[in-house]
Amino acid sequence: FLSQLSSRNIDTLVNVERVQFSDKVVALDINGVPGDVYRLYKGAFNRQPDWEGIGYWIHRVEQGGASLVQVAREFTFSPEFNRLYPANQTETAFVSQEYQNMLGRAPDIDGLNFYADSLILGRKTRPQVLADISYSPENRTVVAELVANGIDYLPWIFG
């Protein structure tokens, strides 16, 4: 941790990944696990993650060894996910909704066909598609502005 006080009363942090305050932690390593989990959360639920929720999932990945696909799989069991993506939703509709949630646009025909066919043929699961799209360079760019000042979360402290 290196802090440099400037003449304008601004602290500059160098080589710092996390800053802990009394009420939260701010993850500055937005291209690491916190950024990955944030992008997945945003894509799955079409909203910014709540501090408690993202703190739990960051912990599960960093301390528990969960992969993004495993996190996405657990998201699919939540009531919120099932309200957004009904069980009878077609693969094409699911992929289209994920593109809209994550990238803010309709899928291009190649992407739609690739992911919908992968789901139909059993080459990928919905959690895998969710993780794939969330990890895409385009989604990283879309979310970059949202996390430019870090990712706020509450650390998971319960085992």
Locate the predicted segments by residue.
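Acidic, glycine-rich low-complexity segments
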Residues: F1-V25
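Substrate/cofactor-recognition hotspot
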Residues: E17-G159
